[in-house]
Amino acid sequence: MADPAAPAPAQAQAAAAPTPAAAPAAAAPPPAPATDSASGPSSDSGPEAGSQRLLFSHDLVSGRYRGSVHFGLVRLIHGEDSDSEGDDDGRGSSGCSEAGGAGHEEGRASPLRRGYVRVQWYPEGVKQHVKETKLKLEDRSVVPRDVVRHMRSTDSQCGTVIDVNIDCAVKLIGTNCIIYPVNSKDLQHIWPFMYGDYIAYDCWLGKVYDLKNQIILKLSNGARCSMNTEDGAKLYDVCPHVSDSGLFFDDSYGFYPGQVLIGPAKIFSSVQWLSGVKPVLSTKSKFRVVVEEVQVVELKVTWITKSFCPGGTDSVSPPPSIITQENLGRVKRLGCFDHAQRQLGERCLYVFPAKVEPAKIAWECPEKNCAQGEGSMAKKVKRLLKKQVVRIMSCTPDTQCPRDHSMEDPDKKGEARAGSEIGSASPEEQPDGSASPVEMQDEGSEELQETCEPLPPFLLKEGGDDGLHSAEQDADDEAADDTDDTSSVTSSASSTTSSQSGSGTGRKKSIPLSIKNLKRKHKRKKNKVTRDFKPGDRVAVEVVTTMTSADVMWQDGSVECNIRSNDLFPVHHLDNNEFCPGDFVVDKRVQSCPDPAVYGVVQSGDHVGRTCMVKWFKLRPSGDDVELIGEEEDVSVYDIADHPDFRFRTTDIVIRIGNTEDGALPKEDEPSVGQVARVDVSSKVEVVWADNSKTIILPQHLYNIESEIEESDYDSVEGSSSGASSDEWEDDSDSWETDNGLVDDEHPKIEELAAILPAEQPTAPEEDKGVVISEEAATAAIQGAVAMAAPVAGLMEKAGKDGPPKSFRELKEAIKILESLKNMTVEQLLTGSPTSPTVEPEKPTREKKFLDDIKKLQENLKKTLDNVAIAEEEKMEAVPDTERKEEKPEVQSPVKAEWPSETPVLCQQCGGRPGVTFTSAKGEVFSVLEFAPSNHSFKKIEFQPPEAKKFFSTVRKEMALLATSLPDGIMVKTFEDRMDLFSALIKGPTRTPYEDGLYLFDIQLPNIYPAVPPHFCYLSQCSGRLNPNLYDNGKVCVSLLGTWIGKGTERWTSKSSLLQVLISIQGLILVNEPYYNEAGFDSDRGLQEGYENSRCYNEMALIRVVQSMTQLVRRPPEVFEQEIRQHFSVGGWRLVNRIESWLETHAMQERAQVMPNGALKDSSSLEPMAAAELSDSGREEPEDVGMAPGEASQGSDSEGGAQGPASASRDHTEQTETAPDASAPPSVRPKRRRKSYRSFLPEKSGYPDIGFPLFPLSKGFIKSIRGVLTQFRAALLEAGMPESTEDK
């Protein structure tokens, strides 16, 4: 989809992030504005400037948009999942369409190209694809708990952000008054609660999924009333802002104190009058009102869990899901880290402190109507902050600020320009930059004279002889005609803490201006502007720029404070073996004591050496304290693991589950829900409770409910979870769900789907788009439709050569849409939210309506499938009967019955007699055994094919293919008594970390095979994963198996075969750099960070491979026992010797570095091998990162991989496309990928080419690998496999 269309160029507005002040008394000097070509990265961006990213999500950047400098937020970077962004991609650097209104996107999505980022420009919210080097980083967004590294340091260790300090430049909404600097801790949320907030209600933790709001309004006659936000939305803002119509603006929270609204009297017919004289509600009158306060009157909450509550009730029943206004006082919001979340475009409340000297105000002309052009604000703000500012004047509490101030001061350096010709010029006529800034300095307080009723302090006033008097005479029924510029600004910026009316007339409106008022504006055009205020006043502001500094605790235990965030870069893909000080760990070494009361606390870490200093603690029997065991120990990171229960990170939400510290008696009102503030190396956790009190508490007394929070976000609490069949396959790291390449549009998908279905299909009316529905129910319904429609994929492929008929094209589009809907969350699918345990009476009705619509969709699609299958049957080529029968619901339930009598005959027809072994052309074997082993993963699953003869016909073809086409390194066995079961053994490819290893799989063919893919189970032999796609719970992630949705030939169809899956596992999973198989990690290929992570992953993989092979030697599975022994009698010792040779090579290189004379000799002796490898593996060519993760993982350095012609051709295409960048200067080549990982090795390092990144070996790896090699040797000797002389 194209970028949202933007307003006219004159409307563009942005703000720069000021840098630290150069002089104490002056405003912070801003960074230099970008030039016409936009500034690229500075030359000092680090030693590896060309091998690390320039920008990350949420970065504040500046660049040229529509001819002027704008500021914006990076919303998406290449290789990042676009879940939250949908597919509203822009059009690259060419810009966006000029047509349409701001914030509306159009066109079709385009992929985010390498080297580009998606930027959302402020204030309109237009999204655009821009080249990274055309943007200037103004402020990097980091929050507590982020893992970061130094941008300008050779030190590669990472650290954890423990606190941030954000200085903001804020603009008073409705004006162009800029206040800087304002610390983010001094900004408050406008609304006390918002959607998605986590709250504590007595002992319960919940999440707000809906809320009911109201606004308190004050009329000019002093009357006050309360109005719900639905009616309030019918009023319009007298002082609108450009961002009100852009994507930075949230309609749900569009009201703020001090806002001036106007609307017809009929809207006030249903309000509740609180005080004052109720005005006459004339049909022709219009009321002008000031928002005095915004209130939440009702919360709807999904309850997550209950905490330890000694003084409370023992009931486990959650409170009512609806919290009414009288109980809101018992609700406490978890928001101790709100100050770290401020970003561009956010609206907040600012309370002026008692000491205001540090704050600076720069004021330019009042902001024009959002329909008028403003020019670019970025340069103006920079210039104002750099040159001169308006000095703040502090009024004493009893000093009243008059409404009229017309005194001229000849010493002022400029004129207050009150927006010439507001409302008279069209956007096209308004020139860019017409709203020039005011550069003036207030010389001090002046003798002021009250002319009328005083208004609240902190006013932006303009002189005028008649304007303010006319404001006094403003009646409600005349509000639409009064456009006094001054009083509008006064109202919008007035303090809600004052008891004054705050009413006034409009500075700018979307209604026509009278000639009288237009003349009045021109008359006051040159009047001076001042602003007075008093401490404690609250004003609504909008963040226009930020400057962030962070405190970081590094892995070595040191703490560095006030680091400019631009000098850091976030680490998104963190190795599981990276530990930080304060992490709780357990010992994985076999000789360690498995006492559950013993745990370790990381004191410091050596990132390069891959070791940690750990203190071991043991919980005392009393349970109220711990004792230190032994001395601090230097441990390899591969020998420890995260504690299964004690996982605490800053900002985690926790509940108290145990007694208080030191045996103190629990208080009845003791807080029990809070957030982690700090994890201490002393084995305790500091918690900020919901009442803002702090406690340092033992981890045994806390429970981290982050996992429950994630489940509550995705699962409905009304029904059961997604079912055992789903749960048993899901773990805490579902990284296998890689980018599927499908377009996941949001609401347009529903409309598109409705359009392609037959006319009789009922569709939900437009007003039902906001239905609230549990995601589980919606997902179950959609998955049902997809599961029912999926088998037709193979049917469609059998269409004639002339192309599929229209009915098939429509059906294919419907299936595609359903698949994309299946992968979307409910929040993406609908403008709603998860339901609570108890909902309002009308909610189940709307949910039922949605489910009924989905059910009708399923039924209609099923009818379409049936009709198409019948109508096109004669046009198809031998469509298998099983594909036409698979839609019958009764075939899904297994029925226990005897195997048909023709089974042995079928076995004989395919040569499947028990004990018969077939040797393929490449020397591998396929054999049929008599009985399936009892420990086969799928043996206990009852199976009865609906059409036995047809099913066995398919099996016969599979067996024939396996018997003749198995490649090197794959063995398969099936069983006479269960021909739906298979067992497979795959040898690890050479020049990969998996070489000389054996990897076993159990397989079952479903009853409707081949309409659906086979079931695979990996037989893991170690704790943890040795490959991103092979889980220790048995899950195998390959696109052909449907565990993630691939593209084209990567998807399973009725023509796919078991052999294809086995080859995919061998060639696309067991690769030389498995790290890049992780979802989204392939975008790191060619970056320094990616290389380091890949090397460390290979270290971990090698350790787990040796551990797995040790288990296989000691307890070989029955099916392949003979093959395993035969393999390891030779391959086992080959594996041992190869790793030992790597250890010796590393030791030699270490000695060579210590002795310079020897270094030259050692390096020169080994360098020719490295040079030869480099010439063989490719010439430092750009690499295609657009391939599927599995395909891209098999680099050119691997000889045993399965990088086919298709991959090679794509590589060649990518090289051609990126060739023009070769002549560009280094600063514009930050994302250039290199084919060979060896390019990251130190020059003339002399390390041999082993096919995958491993050198230099870390100290932790050497410690761990020696330990597991010792165990492997012992296992080989115990199994009667002594090392031969040839092996040595």
Swiss-Prot record:
Residues bearing PTM Phosphoserine: S45, S82, S84, S394, S436, S510, S833, S836, S893
Subcellular location: Cytoplasm; Nucleus
Enzyme Commission number(s): 2.3.2.24
Domain of life: Eukaryota
Bias kind Basic and acidic residues: ranges: 401-418, 462-472, 872-890
Major location category of this protein: cytoplasm
Low complexity: compositionally biased ranges: 1-26, 34-47, 486-502, 717-726
Free-text description of this protein's post-translational modifications in UniProt: Phosphorylated. Phosphorylation affects subcellular location. Ubiquitinated: autoubiquitinates, possibly affecting its subcellular location.
Pfam families, per database record: SH3-A_UBE2O, SH3-B_UBE2O, SH3-C_UBE2O, tSH3-B_UBE2O, UQ_con
Biased composition (Basic residues): 517-528
Keywords: ATP-binding, Coiled coil, Cytoplasm, Nucleotide-binding, Nucleus, Phosphoprotein, Transferase, Ubl conjugation, Ubl conjugation pathway
Modified residues (Phosphothreonine): T483, T486, T835
Subunit structure comment from the entry: Interacts with CPNE1 (via VWFA domain) and CPNE4 (via VWFA domain). Interacts with UBR2.
Protein name: (E3-independent) E2 ubiquitin-conjugating enzyme UBE2O
Name of the gene: Ube2o
